[in-house]
């Protein structure tokens, strides 16, 4: 029966320690690689998420631009329609005022013509004494009354 201390081979405890140390180093190296791989994967997922968010933001921006353009076009069309209605109303107002003013002028003209017809006496009914005290100078008015109409445009 031999004693263990008399053996001439390498120390088994030292070999066991070295083996455990190598195993711990391998596990540590493996953990570092797993951690690095996790960081790379997290970074890549972040890149993909940011890319997706950028695409979504650009699409939302395009939709907003389209919508603003559509709203502006509708506003412009409404303004043009209102302007057309305003112009038509103004033209109708001017025409109506013109017709009424012309009607008033015609009414005034007719009244003057009727008044002149009352004042005109036929020539055969005038018997003037040319000698003596009564001398009347009578000028026969023309068939049309003389008056001037001034039309002012605004």
Swiss-Prot record:
Residues 89-118 form the IQ domain. InterPro entries: IQ_motif_EF-hand-BS, IQCF. SMART domains: IQ (SM00015). One of its GO terms (molecular function) is calmodulin binding. It comes from the Eukaryota. This is IQ domain-containing protein F3. The gene is IQCF3.
